[in-house]
Amino acid sequence: DSGELAHPLAGVPMAVKDLISTKGVRTTCASKMLENYVPVFDATVVQKLDAIGAVCLGKTNMDEFAMGSSTESSYFGVTRNPWDASRVPGGSSGGSAAAVAAREVFYALGSDTGGSIRQPASFCGVTGIKPTYGAVSRYGLLAYASSLDQIGPLTIDARDAAAVTAALMGRDEMDATSVDAPAPALPEKTRLDGLRVGIPQAYFGDGLDEQVRARVMDAAHELEALGATLVAVDMPILRYAIPAYYILACAEASSNLSRYDGVKYGFRPAHFEDLHDLYLTARSEGFGAEVKRRIMLGAFALSSGYYDAYYNKALRVKALIKRGFDACFEKADILLTPAAPTTAYPLGAHADDPIQMYLGDIYTVSVNMAGL
């Protein structure tokens, strides 16, 4: 009625990962602990999309508290890959990736702490962006690791990803880590003359599936055909990324998840003897196995006897990883890497081998640690 043009995303069906607060709508983090939690406010990203007329169809499944890479640890059951129902969609934003791949929505919001947007996007054949840390407000995101978490979109293609990311970005007074950053814009030209594409050698070593290697190099040669120059770069510090990441992320998780104690909100057992028993029972029954595993790992790393030996060393590795990326970007404008060592694997393949699942994050966690 005002005569103004509607936003390009107005009326477009979308979905929201179930750890992003939605006023009046359950936000469970796929956990028994928050099975009946209903926020009284919207996350900033939800407010922004609501203001431009986006249509939210619902919340998407995920690994419990975003701790996983397969969306198999959800209290509400697994999500299957829409291309092959016997395989995982990736995680932890597997529900968002699957919803977009199945064309149930045009885009969905996810979160990425160590690859949780990029890996499921790869497994489901969609486009995922982890925005630079601080470019998108985290207000209303139920935290896993606050220094690493970032909200971003999963979409059908790159142009949609740019449009949604632009709508989400901007400084927010409710998030002190947020900043004003230039919104992404895809050029109309198809030539890439002058663009230097870095190929980090450390990302193409042992453990990378040959099919994945071939497809990434196919993409590299396509970029080269459009005028880009391929440049070999290296990041030897990458081999320390996984242990450092899991020390830091789990340490932050052990602190962030300490708020779920059965007293203020969340799961509360029907019977308990005293306050200590309430804490013990609420957390034992409210958290799943993987969440408890990571809380214990984080608490161990922060304990007085191991703080310097593990946590402080992991912080030093984090700083070295950032320097490694800085060195790469002196030679290249962008880096081309795999998102995961393999394609989507069968459901249950890593159920009894959490270390193997952790190693699947090798190509993604370093970006979060560098704040890129």
Where are these regions (language model features)?
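Flexible, low-complexity linker/loop segments at domain and module junctions
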Residues: 2-12, 183-197, 331-332, 336
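Glycine-rich, small-residue loops and helix-cap segments
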Residues: 11, 51, 55, 105, ...
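Glycine/threonine-rich flexible loop motifs
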Residues: 27-36, 209-210, 345-356
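Short, solvent-exposed turn/loop segments enriched in Gly/Ser/Thr/Pro and often Arg
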Residues: 60-68, 237-241, 340
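Glycine/threonine-rich beta-strand-loop-alpha-helix active-site module
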Residues: 71, 111-139
